[in-house]
A protein has these predicted regions:
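N-terminal "domain-start" segment that seeds a small globular fold
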Residues: 2-40
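Conserved redox-active cysteine motifs that mediate thiol-disulfide chemistry
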Residues: 52-69, 587-588
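Structural microenvironment flanking redox-active thiols in thiol-disulfide oxidoreductases
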Residues: 61-103, 114-118
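Short, internal strand/loop/helix patches
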Residues: 98-127, 131-133
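Thiol-/selenol-based redox modules, centered on thioredoxin-like
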Residues: 134-200, 552
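Gly/Pro-rich loop segments of beta-rich domains
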Residues: 170-190, 222-269, 303-352, 382-406, ...
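Residue-level detector of Asp-centered blade-edge/turn motifs that repeat once per structural unit
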Residues: 194-202, 272-281, 356-360, 412-415, ...
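Extracellular/lumen-exposed scaffold segments
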Residues: 223, 548-691
Length: 691
């Protein structure tokens, strides 16, 4: 039986008699400081938020967006330091990190921590992790996951009041030095589609100019911009834009209207609707407006932009602004909007790509932020979950039980199979619909969240590295934008040659040496055969055309695993505790019982003899197989809190908040008699821990 645990409410600062001094910030170099090194001693007198992140991680990008208004409000007393601790090998490349900081508009100092030195010093175990340091240099909070912004507001206010009274708060500017702006025609383009005969001129393409927060049409030369919608004109000076009451060049935001008025925020996926559907609904293109958490519609004739789905509030994790709460089967509060509601009232989460399923008559949406696929019927205006339970990982089976991980690319082939670039598992997945209408998910390439590499050959042994794009070819094969390997790869399913002999499935490399390719599309000749490949080369800020090669490459640079430190544990009982303290001004929502939950599993499954499964409470006794040597513990913790005062009932109209984090913790298992010094018999994690 699982022990139940009810966490305590958050105390006011100071929180503990014994305080822990924050560790030094050690890494390879600093970004956004004008070349200066930064130490915690330099930051004395400021409230410091250390944001442990990695640029592949959608949850980390959500946290960066959450922090922007907090940083703006407390700009004279708060310093955020991004500690970049990479998951993938490519993320340790300094040029790749430079590009990511620019692309995601990170406006605070960033410590490059490729060896995870500072990550380990602060006992970080998950991306993202936030550590709050007070103006005297002591750790006061350790937060995992998203959705902490309301609690951070109250915590920062308390710290400012306390240290202003003590005389230990220093107001003024911090160490952030903005980089010099660079003018470009395209800036970190994300996705592209061919317009066929529906563009301004033959052979033109529509491009998500993601870094400029706009959509552009480019000519067949892939460089000439024919027209732009949203974001302002990057060639126009800001003063001129203000004088004309137009959006500032590269302005992000959400606004419907004509091409000069509309605003997007990091748009990515694009879909050209069939002409008959477009005529019925009044727009031609569906846009995945990623950071606005919305689907948008674009008329090619007028440039008019409308909002199709999404209320602008990020689904599930970023629940700080959601005013209504639902409950799942365990009684835990969640902020899922009613999927049967008006699509404009539904919360989405970082839609990254869109594709058309002709058989279903629906737009399929890669909902990267919740690790799911959604569908949208543009005629009936109905939104629904297409596949995925909402947990991050690689699990095949019935669509409503499958696990995805930040799906970022979609393509439907001639047989109706939906191909998915599942970026965080470095996998290519597929969703197939049976004659009975039931959908199933399986994996063509890839093995899990922490396995990657550049290996061709047998799909069972092949490896990718964070692919973001996929396109199906007429011969049944699939091209993959293998983003972090800088390559275009090809998956060919099992087939039969002209002589009737079986040809096994295989993975090969089409081309390499690209700068983070995020999408790939194929141009066909007059005979319908593939002729050229167009690649969206994101970090080169361009589209590039590549001839289809006569032969494909076979590459084997080895399989890799994410280099996370392993925790030595003793076989047998392992006590798991997740700390959670509700922020000031909130209290645990106990109206329907214990509002906390743990979900535990392991890879391999045999690692856990007891303690797997889902139940309420934030403590559990796990039992590890003494025959096991190593593995990964997968832990998901949830807690629900609502605005309210301690000792008083929660008001009926109170805003409720869901806190959630997933951990994948590599462990090395030792027999008790042979365990090294320091091997753990308990595992303490923080969902929201105060010190």
């Amino acid at each position: 039986m699982t022990e139940q645990h009810t966490p305590a409410e958050a105390p006011s600062v100071p929180r503990a008699a014994s305080r822990v001094r924050a560790s030094s910030l050690v890494g390879r170099r600093w970004l956004n400081t004008g070349g200066d090194q930064v130490t915690l001693e330099d930051l004395r007198g400021k409230v410091v938020v250390l944001d442990f992140w990695t640029f592949c991680c959608i949850n980390c990008l959500h946290v960066a967006d959450e922090l922007r208004p907090l940083e703006a409000e407390f700009e004279d007393v708060l310093v955020t330091v991004g500690v970049h601790s990479p998951k993938f090998e490519h993320e340790a490349d300094p040029d790749a990190l430079d590009a990511a900081v620019e692309r995601y508009e990170i406006a605070h100092p960033v410590l490059d921590d490729p060896e995870l030195t500072t990550w380990q010093a602060y006992s970080a175990r998950a991306w993202p992790t936030l550590v709050v340091v007070d103006p005297e240099g002591y750790i006061v909070a350790h937060l995992s996951g998203e959705g902490h912004v309301a609690g951070l507001y109250s915590l920062v206010q308390e710290l400012v009041a306390e240290h202003e009274a003590k005389g230990t708060l220093h107001r003024g500017s911090g160490p952030y030095v903005p980089p010099a702006p660079v003018a470009r025609d395209l800036k970190f383009p994300g996705k592209a589609i061919a317009l066929g005969g529906r563009g301004t001129e033959p052979g033109s393409l529509l491009v998500a100019d993601t870094g400029h927060h706009r959509i552009v049409e480019v000519a067949s030369d892939l460089t000439t911009v024919l027209r732009a919608v949203g974001g302002g004109d990057p060639a126009q000076a800001p003063a001129e834009a203000a004088e004309l009451a137009l959006p500032t060049p590269g302005m992000r935001g959400h606004r419907d209207g004509g091409p000069d008025e509309a605003l997007f925020s990091e748009p990515n996926g694009l879909l050209l609707l069939p002409e008959d559907v477009a005529a019925e609904v009044g727009y031609d293109v569906v846009v995945a407006d990623t950071v606005n958490h919305r689907l948008r519609g674009l008329s090619l004739a007028t440039g008019e932009v409308t909002t199709l789905a999404g209320n602008g509030v990020q689904k599930l994790i970023d629940s700080e602004r959601v005013r209504e709460a639902a409950r799942d089967e365990e009684g835990v509060a969640v902020d899922l909007a009613d999927i049967d509601a008006d699509p404009l009232a539904v919360s989405l989460s970082s839609p990254w790509d869109v594709a058309w399923d002709a058989a279903a008559g629906r737009v399929i949406v890669a909902m990267a932020g919740t690790h799911q696929l959604f569908s949208f019927d543009p005629v009936a205006r109905v939104l629904s979950v297409w596949a995925g339970i909402g947990l991050e990982g690689l699990t095949d089976g019935p669509a409503d039980e499958a696990w995805f991980a930040q799906s970022s690319g979609l393509s439907v082939d001639a047989e109706g199979t939906l191909w998915v670039a599942d970026s965080e598992t470095s996998a290519v997945r597929r969703v197939r619909t049976g004659d009975d209408g039931a959908r199933t998910v399986d994996t063509a390439v890839g093995t899990g969240l922490f396995d990657f590499g550049h290996v061709d050959g047998d799909p069972a042994q092949a490896r990718l590295q964070h692919p973001l794009g996929v396109t199906a070819l007429p011969d049944g094969s699939v091209l993959v934008a293998d983003t972090y390997n800088g390559a275009i790869r090809r998956y060919a399913p099992e087939s039969t040659d002209a002589a009737g002999r079986a040809v096994p499935a295989s993975v090969s490399t089409v081309t390499r040496g690209l700068a983070e390719p995020a999408d790939v599309l194929v141009e066909h000749g007059e005979d319908g055969a593939p002729q050229d490949i167009v690649v969206v080369e994101t970090n080169a800020h361009r589209l590039v055309r590549i001839a289809v090669p006569g032969e494909y490459l076979t590459v084997d640079e080895g399989a890799r695993q994410t280099a996370r430190p392993r925790t030595d544990v003793v076989a047998g009982e392992l006590e798991l505790t997740v700390g959670f303290a509700a922020p000031s001004g909130q209290k645990l929502d106990e109206r329907w019982g214990d509002p906390t939950q743990l979900k535990v599993s392991s890879s391999p499954e045999s690692l856990l003899l007891d303690g797997a499964g889902t139940s309420v409470g934030l403590t559990r006794t796990l039992r590890l197989d003494p025959e096991a040597t190593e593995g990964v513990l997968h832990i998901t913790a949830r807690a629900a809190a609502c605005d309210g005062e301690h000792g008083r009932p929660i008001p009926d109209n109170a805003a409720c908040h869901l806190y959630q984090q997933d951990w994948g913790i590599p462990v090395r298992v030792h027999a008790r008699e042979a365990a090294p010094e320091g091997a753990e018999t308990r595992l303490d994690l923080d969902l929201r821990g105060l010190h």
